[in-house]
Design a protein with these regions (language model features):
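C-terminal segment of classical bacterial N-terminal signal peptides
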Residues: 17-26
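Electrostatic cytochrome c docking/interface patches
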Residues: 29-59
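Short cysteine/histidine-rich zinc-coordinating motifs and their immediately flanking basic loops
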Residues: 77-84
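The canonical Cys-X-X-Cys-His
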Residues: 60-72, 128
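C-terminal capping alpha-helices of c-type cytochrome domains
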Residues: 105-136
């Protein structure tokens, strides 16, 4: 393979890698930005009290979010089945929480299916996040 073709191939790979990194950076967010997005999608204002009720209430699968994340999400939790430690959910205590849209969506999708038996709706996500953002 001639040198120029190899070099061109490397340039294409480098450009693709850079585009992927930039796309990942575009998913970075703040909890307030995610809250605004969920509220806009839901078409209603988020209510922290509804978020707390949803988080602590047992749902159809007999679990609550608080089963693993504790009723005080400023503290670390523990998965009830695996025993795996879970970092605090409150953004004020854990600066990594709710800073990546893709990761936030992944965990909402997985955990809501486990706890509620379905994906959470935008208004539920907004309410939960609004409540978590009130915790210091």
């Amino acid at each position: 393979m001639p040198f120029s073709i190899r070099r061109h191939g490397l340039a294409v790979c480098a450009a693709a890698l850079w585009a992927g990194l930039n796309a990942s950076a575009a998913l970075a967010a703040t909890p307030a930005e995610l809250l605004a997005g969920y509220s806009a999608e839901a078409g209603v204002r988020a209510e922290p009290a509804r978020g707390q009720a949803f988080f602590t209430q047992r749902h159809g699968q007999e679990w609550a979010c608080a089963s693993c994340h504790t009723a005080n999400p400023t503290q670390a939790g523990k998965h009830v089945v695996t025993g795996k430690s879970i970092a605090p959910m409150a953004p004020a205590v854990n600066a990594q929480r709710f800073t990546d849209l893709a990761k936030t969506e992944k965990w909402f999708r997985r955990n809501c299916k486990d706890v509620v038996g379905r994906e959470c709706q935008a208004n539920e996500k907004a309410d939960i996040l609004a409540w978590l953002m009130t915790l210091k």
